[in-house]
Amino acid sequence: MLLVIGLGNPGKEYQYTRHNVGFIAIEKIVNQYNSSFSTKKKFNCEIAETISDGQKIIFIKPTTYMNLSGKSVISVKTYYNIYPAKIFVIHDDIDLETGRIKFKTGGGNGGHNGLKSIDGVIGNNYNRIRIGVGRPQNNQGVADYVLNHFSKPEYETVMQAIDRITSNFGLILENKLEEFKNKIA
């Protein structure tokens, strides 16, 4: 069983912001598996489930704000008894140029409040799919930057990155994580 978490903030005003790139990516992956999200208040998230190659996959989008994402993650992790090695978090990363993707297991949170929240409840030995959104320019604050919408060229670049994640997601199911890492880079 896998647990895949897309990080973002709830609400239409945040829908296509840089900070919601995790939501955008997970929605595309869920569509690929012909599944859809439904709200589960007891888990503080939207959840979608599917079975592929005999393996159950649980996808979640926390309905808390980013800095409380751990609340959703711990409730789903505990309910389904999922080990951190089977958890994959998709999130924005300002330390990567727009559209660049990196995959890693464990490590620090890089100041990302969603990851800080998750680390606080399950530790940091889970998998991360980091999608670059670039750094703020012209003295713009980080919070303002990540809560703003992509420009059209940025959005197109990010969607190409998300397409690489989606088209190679099956490698995660096959536990070919190194191959996944290389194909999405």
From Swiss-Prot:
Main enzyme class: hydrolase
Database matches in Gene3D superfamilies: Peptidyl-tRNA hydrolase
GO biological process, one term: rescue of stalled ribosome
EC number: 3.1.1.29
PROSITE patterns (alphabetical): PEPT_TRNA_HYDROL_1, PEPT_TRNA_HYDROL_2
Catalytic activity: an N-acyl-L-alpha-aminoacyl-tRNA + H2O = an N-acyl-L-amino acid + a tRNA + H(+)
GO cellular component: cytoplasm
Site residues, Discriminates between blocked and unblocked aminoacyl-tRNA: N9
Site (Stabilizes the basic form of H active site to accept a proton): D92
Active site: H19 (proton acceptor)
Binding, tRNA: Y14, Y65, N67, N113
Pfam hit, one: Pept_tRNA_hydro
GO molecular function, one term: tRNA binding
The UniProt record lists the keyword tRNA-binding: yes
Location of the protein in the cell: Cytoplasm
Keyword field: Cytoplasm, Hydrolase, RNA-binding, tRNA-binding
Subunit and partners: Monomer.
Similarity-based family: Belongs to the PTH family.
Role played: Hydrolyzes ribosome-free peptidyl-tRNAs (with 1 or more amino acids incorporated), which drop off the ribosome during protein synthesis, or as a result of ribosome stalling.
Protein name: Peptidyl-tRNA hydrolase
Source organism (scientific name): Rickettsia conorii (strain ATCC VR-613 / Malish 7)
Recorded name of the encoding gene: pth
